[in-house]
Amino acid sequence: LDSKLRGTVVLNIGKTPGAGLAFYNRLQNTLSLTRVVARPDSMEAIRKRLLGSQRVIVVVTSDDYKKYKTMLDSLPADLPVIYVFLMPLKSMLDMEGYWKKAAAVVLGHTDESVIQEYVADVLVGKAVADGRLSVAVADLFKPGDGVTITPKVSRIYRPEDYGMDSKIL
């Protein structure tokens, strides 16, 4: 994430007001942020707050996100929205349309504090993304897609990892 961009809003969607707080606190060390906790009774106020931002990071820690789908649909296409899912992938497979429109999608698979902090570090370049998907993500990615990083070992890239044929190159 570009640390020079001001006006970033983190929208936390979870079962409790503290959902996603470890992510926000870690990210706040590097970026200028505002945090908004999603509540079904304040949809219009939340939407207006998001429209006034330069970038939105939607942090989802429970299936409560389904209550907010209409509001998320109403965000302008030119507003960069990053989705951070801190819950099992299989519980959010109906989010395909959002993934396709997103500036970025990060799958953390759990809302444990240590994972929230690690994901925040990945977004600001303080940590590397590591791992492969265990399940398909709609028609965007298949199981096994991703990168596995072994510490202290140089990365070896093969054209086949990126859909190219090394025999042709």
Q: Could you describe each region identified by the protein language model?
A:
Residues 167-169:
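Short proline/glycine- and basic residue-enriched helix-capping loop/turn segments at helix->loop/beta transitions
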Residues 1-165:
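Preference for extracellular/luminal or secreted protein segments
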